């Protein structure tokens, strides 16, 4: 028989840096999950990624207090900021441009995020990433 799901917990945790402090500790402690067990498993799964990169994770907590988790790809905005070499997006994206990204960089980000995005082709995913870039005040160059 399948385990009964008690809760889904969605968090963004820095790759390889999960620890029992907030936001991980309170969110999982509230559900009765062994926090250190999650931290060790998450850090082991994300050790190949760049340390400190925020990774969205969905934790499924079962009634017997066991858990499973699925890691997603980093948010598009984080990957775009890294590609453009900026700290943050523009406060006024239509007026103030803060950086530039090339179509090749947009394609690379779209391919990285392909598993988590909807859309039939890589071109539609690239359009979505380019839209995110424009909303951050980045110029997409040919």
From Swiss-Prot:
Matching InterPro entries: Ribosomal_uL11, Ribosomal_uL11_bac-typ, Ribosomal_uL11_C, Ribosomal_uL11_C_sf, Ribosomal_uL11_N, Ribosomal_uL11_N_sf
PTM info: One or more lysine residues are methylated.
One Gene Ontology term of the molecular function aspect: large ribosomal subunit rRNA binding
Keyword set includes Metal-binding: no
Disulfide bond annotation, renumbered to this chain: none
Gene Ontology, cellular component aspect: cytosolic large ribosomal subunit
Biological-process GO terms, alphabetical: translation
Gene3D superfamilies: Ribosomal protein L11, C-terminal domain, Ribosomal protein L11/L12, N-terminal domain
UniProt keyword annotation of Ribosomal protein present: yes
Keyword terms of this UniProt record: Methylation, Ribonucleoprotein, Ribosomal protein, RNA-binding, rRNA-binding
Complex formation: Part of the ribosomal stalk of the 50S ribosomal subunit. Interacts with L10 and the large rRNA to form the base of the stalk. L10 forms an elongated spine to which L12 dimers bind in a sequential fashion forming a multimeric L10(L12)X complex.
Family note: Belongs to the universal ribosomal protein uL11 family.
Biological function: Forms part of the ribosomal stalk which helps the ribosome interact with GTP-bound translation factors.
Protein name: Large ribosomal subunit protein uL11
Organism this protein belongs to: Haemophilus influenzae (strain PittGG)
């Amino acid at each position: 028989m399948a385990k009964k799901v008690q809760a889904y917990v969605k968090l963004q945790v820095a790759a390889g840096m999960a620890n029992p402090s907030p936001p991980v500790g309170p969110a999982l402690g509230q559900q009765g999950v062994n926090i250190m067990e999650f931290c060790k498993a998450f850090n082991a799964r994300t050790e190949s990624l760049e340390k400190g990169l925020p990774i969205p994770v969905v934790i499924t907590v079962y009634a017997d207090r066991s858990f499973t988790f699925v890691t997603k790809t980093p948010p598009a905005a984080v990957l775009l900021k890294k590609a453009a070499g900026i700290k943050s997006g523009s406060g006024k994206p239509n007026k103030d441009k803060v950086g530039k990204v090339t179509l090749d960089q947009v394609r690379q980000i779209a391919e990285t995020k392909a598993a988590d995005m909807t859309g039939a082709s890589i071109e539609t995913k690239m359009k979505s990433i380019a839209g995110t870039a424009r909303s951050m005040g980045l110029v997409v160059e040919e």
